[in-house]
UniProtKB/Swiss-Prot annotation:
Domain of life: Bacteria
Coiled-coil stretches noted in the UniProt entry, renumbered to this chain: none
Gene Ontology MF: a single term: structural constituent of ribosome
Keyword vocabulary terms for this entry: Ribonucleoprotein, Ribosomal protein, RNA-binding, rRNA-binding
Function: This protein binds to 23S rRNA in the presence of protein L20.
PANTHER family: 50S RIBOSOMAL PROTEIN L21, LARGE RIBOSOMAL SUBUNIT PROTEIN BL21M
The protein's name: Large ribosomal subunit protein bL21
Membership in a protein family: Belongs to the bacterial ribosomal protein bL21 family.
GO annotation terms (biological process): translation
Recorded name of the encoding gene: rplU
């Protein structure tokens, strides 16, 4: 069984007990959060596709870790003009473990 949901403007496909890396969430470590913007629920017997979201469907997850990724460098330059601009960026992330996937009737 798996589900597809939206978090931080991106779509993620998850199964139970999977650890995924999401965009930064403003919740403390060790808390349980619930995602309700579920696009699709899939079980070996049935598929539920939302319009746009599956009503009553939730995904419960446990926050494992907060952090930052490696620095990426952005370099912009013009040739023959002696112009160069450098910038770096480190993206924040949150690691989450999927605890449970529920539909409106209970488990899918």
């Amino acid at each position: 069984m798996y589900a597809v949901f939206i978090s931080g403007g991106k779509q993620y496909r998850v199964v139970k007990n999977q650890i995924i890396r999401l965009e930064k969430l403003n919740s403390p470590l060790g808390t349980t959060i619930e995602f309700d913007k579920i696009l699709m629920l899939f079980d070996k017997d049935s598929i539920k596709i939302g319009t746009p979201f599956v009503e009553g469907g939730t995904i419960k997850a446990h926050i494992q870790n907060h952090g930052r990724l490696k620095k990426i460098k952005i370099i912009k330059f013009n040739r023959r003009k002696h112009y160069k601009k450098q910038q770096g960026h480190r993206q924040y992330f949150t690691d989450v473990k999927i605890i449970d996937i529920n539909s409106i009737k209970g488990e899918v």
